[in-house]
């Protein structure tokens, strides 16, 4: 059965085409900085927003009428959902997908049901991957939707909930390994608190760290070679989450000795909620040595919640890609569309429109970022700004050649009187705009 039979495979037709079901800027075979756009972007479609979300919100029931979401045998519906998903991936021409365990398999009424259903669906997903050539960018476990996780999973006050969560992650990591996944993501949606009045912060942090240590141990035991990634988010659904932003996650990992085992998966909308730019979070991840992968979407700065809209800003993404490209690009990570159509976008075509437009935006932004990397104007000015630290005096300070006292004595003896130099922010912003809009 075809779920999108009236929609053709999406092809590159160029910027002059007015076909809404064609790529206008994303030519997967176009080479930029020595790689094709497909190799640079490593695009993935997420299962949850695209095939699981029924179009509901807190004020209304599901607005969609997807065939695979209708009542019926749960496992059969899961197989239909997988068929629809892989038809979608294939027609879109995207090389990767992502999932939560309970996106792809019914949870059932017990932990045994969960394990059995998930095992059957992992077999089926493997068949679909083999037939289509689509690969798994990353898997994860849903440890936030069921009421048992209302007080968290790893940070729950009940150790049986911790054990249930550990079982899910064990199976999901095993499945990711078996399906050839390149990463495994840990998003602590309810690893936080709603009130400090009933929360033991130290205990919950210790529990979370113990859980992560067990995941790391299992990864090595089964021989999984992919990356483990934490996805930072400041709040929602909890008031405050322990993986608030990139810097917070890094500090947590260092505190518990996990900084060499776990990296970050950065979502644009989560950066917005944390009061940061997407650019900031990506740059910070590289500075701290924990960059892993990206969830591509956007939030609404006028809303205080996670809107998960498709990315549409070439300007914002150009700076994000600039950081990624100048640090060598993705390794195991990629650009996963953690984005959903709007509740009123009920037609099957809308799923394609959202992804096609966003993929074109990624392609445009990456090419504009490549201009910034190639012309080296930003980096040249940055190097010039810090050039004195590469001189003998600067190197001596950083290498430990001075104590605080001896440096003070040296400064007094030389009568240092440094002068402020321009930061040239306006010039730098002009350079970015010239690259984005093709002015130079």
Swiss-Prot record:
Annotated coiled-coil segments of the chain: none
Subcellular compartments: Cytoplasm
GO molecular function: magnesium ion binding; xylose isomerase activity
Co-factor: note: Binds 2 magnesium ions per subunit.
Active site: 100, 103
Predominant place of localization: cytoplasm
Binding, Mg(2+) 2: 267, 270, 306, 308
Alphabetical list of Gene3D superfamilies matching this protein: Divalent-metal-dependent TIM barrel enzymes (3.20.20.150)
GO cellular component, one term: cytoplasm
Residues holding Mg(2+) 1: 231, 267, 295, 338
Cofactor(s) needed by this chain: Mg(2+)
Biological process, per Gene Ontology: D-xylose metabolic process
Enzyme nomenclature, EC number: 5.3.1.5
Subunit structure, interactors included: Homotetramer.
Record family assignment: Belongs to the xylose isomerase family.
Matches recorded under NCBIfam families: PRK05474.1, xylose_isom_A
Name used for this protein in its record: Xylose isomerase
Gene assigned in the entry: xylA
């Amino acid at each position: 059965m075809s779920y999108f039979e009236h929609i053709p495979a999406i092809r590159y037709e160029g910027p002059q085409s007015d076909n809404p079901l064609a790529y206008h800027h994303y030519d997967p075979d176009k080479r930029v900085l020595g790689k094709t756009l497909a190799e640079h972007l490593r695009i993935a479609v997420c299962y949850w927003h695209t095939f699981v979300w029924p179009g509901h919100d807190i004020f209304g029931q599901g607005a969609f009428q997807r065939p695979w979401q209708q009542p019926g045998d749960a496992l059969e519906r899961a197989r239909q959902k997988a068929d629809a998903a892989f038809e979608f991936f294939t027609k879109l021409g995207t090389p990767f997908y992502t999932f939560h365990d309970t996106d792809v398999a019914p949870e059932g009424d017990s932990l045994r049901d969960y394990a059995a259903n998930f095992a059957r669906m992992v077999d089926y997903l493997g068949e679909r991957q083999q037939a289509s050539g689509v690969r798994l960018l990353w898997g994860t476990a849903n440890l936030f939707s069921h009421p048992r996780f209302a007080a968290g999973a790893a940070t729950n006050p009940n150790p049986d909930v911790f054990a249930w969560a550990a079982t899910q992650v064990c199976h999901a990591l095993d499945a990711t390994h078996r399906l050839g996944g390149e990463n495994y993501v840990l998003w602590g949606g309810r690893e936080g608190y709603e009130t400090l009045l009933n929360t033991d912060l130290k205990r919950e942090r210790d529990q979370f760290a113990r859980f992560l240590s067990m995941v790391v141990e299992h990864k090595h035991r089964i021989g999984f070679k992919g990356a483990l990634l934490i996805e930072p988010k400041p709040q929602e659904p909890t008031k405050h989450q322990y993986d608030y932003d990139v810097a917070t996650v890094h500090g947590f990992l260092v505190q518990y000795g996990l900084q060499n085992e776990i990296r970050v998966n950065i979502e644009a909308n989560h950066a917005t909620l944390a009061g940061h730019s997407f650019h900031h979070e990506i740059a910070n991840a590289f500075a701290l040595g924990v960059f892993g992968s990206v969830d591509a979407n956007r939030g609404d700065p006028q809303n205080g919640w996670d809107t998960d809209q498709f990315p549409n800003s070439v300007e914002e993404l150009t700076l994000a890609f600039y950081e990624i490209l100048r640090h060598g690009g993705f390794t195991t990570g990629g650009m996963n569309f953690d984005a959903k159509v709007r509740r009123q976008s009920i037609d099957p075509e809308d799923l394609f429109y959202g992804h096609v437009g966003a993929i074109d935006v990624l392609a445009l932004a990456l090419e504009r970022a490549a201009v910034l990397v190639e012309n080296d104007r930003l980096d040249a000015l940055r190097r010039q700004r810090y050039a004195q630290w590469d001189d003998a005096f600067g190197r001596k300070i950083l290498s430990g050649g001075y104590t605080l006292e001896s440096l003070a004595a040296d400064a007094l003896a030389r009568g240092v009187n440094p002068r402020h130099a321009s930061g040239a922010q306006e010039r730098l912003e002009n350079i970015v705009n010239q690259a984005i809009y093709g002015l130079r």
